[in-house]
C-alpha cells in the first residue's frame, strides 16, 4: 500500500515490516534480560561459595539460599554448586582431606530434602575413603620407585668416582629419568581416579 504524503510516496508495507522487526527485537531483549538475571545470580552463587571456602560459615550459605525462591534460587544454587564441586580435586596432602569435609558441609546445605542430605553425606564419606586410598597409593608408588632407583644411583656414583676420581652423591630428585617415570606413573593414577571423581560428582548433582 502506497500513501502519497506531500511530494513523496510512503510504502506502508515497509513501515509494517520495520514495526515487525522492532517487535522481534523487543522479544529478544526480554530473553536477554532473563539471561542477564541468570548470570547475575549464578555469579552471586559462585561468590558465596568462594566466601564459604574461606570462612567455613555454612549457616550463612543456608540463610542466603532461603532468601531466594524460584528461578533465582535455582540460578544461585547452580553457581554455588559449580564452584564447590570444582574444588573437589584429587588431594596431594592430608590438608586437602579437611577441605573435602568443608565442601561437604556446603553441598549439604543445597540438598533437595532430608533423604538427599543423607545420601550426600554418604557419598562425601566415600570420597574421603577413596582420597585416603589415593594418597596411600601415591606414597607407596614413590617409595617403590625410590627403592628401584637407589641401586642405579649407586652404580652411577661409582662410575663418576672412577671417571673423575672424586666421590659424588646423587639423589633421585636430581635424576631427570626418575622424575619422568614418576610423573608418568602419577598421570596414569590420576586418570584412573579422575573417572571415579567425575562419576561421584554426577551423583552429587542429582541430590542438589
Q: Where does each model-flagged region fall?
A:
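Short, Lys/Arg-enriched N-terminal segments with co-localized hydrophobic residues
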Residues: 1-11
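Long amphipathic alpha-helical coiled-coil rod/stalk domains
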Residues: 126, 130-133, 137, 141, ...
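Alpha-helical oligomerization segments
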Residues: 166-208
Amino acid at each position: 500500500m502506497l500513501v502519497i504524503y506531500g511530494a513523496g510516496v510512503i510504502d506502508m508495507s515497509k513501515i509494517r515490516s520495520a514495526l515487525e522487526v522492532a517487535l522481534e527485537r523487543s522479544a529478544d531483549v526480554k530473553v536477554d534480560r532473563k539471561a542477564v538475571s541468570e548470570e547475575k545470580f549464578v555469579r552471586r552463587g559462585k561468590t558465596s561459595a568462594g566466601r564459604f571456602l574461606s570462612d567455613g560459615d555454612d549457616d550463612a550459605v543456608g540463610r542466603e539460599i532461603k532468601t531466594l525462591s524460584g528461578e533465582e534460587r535455582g540460578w544461585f544454587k547452580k553457581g554455588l554448586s559449580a564452584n564447590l564441586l570444582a574444588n573437589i580435586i584429587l588431594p596431594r596432602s592430608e590438608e586437602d582431606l579437611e577441605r573435602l569435609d568443608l565442601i561437604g558441609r556446603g553441598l549439604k546445605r543445597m540438598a533437595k530434602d532430608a533423604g538427599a542430605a543423607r545420601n550426600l553425606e554418604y557419598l562425601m564419606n566415600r570420597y574421603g575413603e577413596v582420597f585416603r586410598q589415593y594418597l596411600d597409593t601415591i606414597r607407596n608408588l614413590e617409595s617403590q620407585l625410590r627403592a628401584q632407583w637407589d641401586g642405579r644411583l649407586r652404580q652411577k656414583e661409582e662410575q663418576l668416582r672412577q671417571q673423575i676420581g672424586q666421590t659424588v652423591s646423587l639423589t633421585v630428585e636430581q635424576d631427570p629419568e626418575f622424575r619422568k617415570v614418576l610423573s608418568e606413573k602419577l598421570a596414569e593414577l590420576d586418570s584412573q581416579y579422575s573417572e571415579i571423581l567425575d562419576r561421584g560428582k554426577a551423583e552429587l548433582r542429582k541430590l542438589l
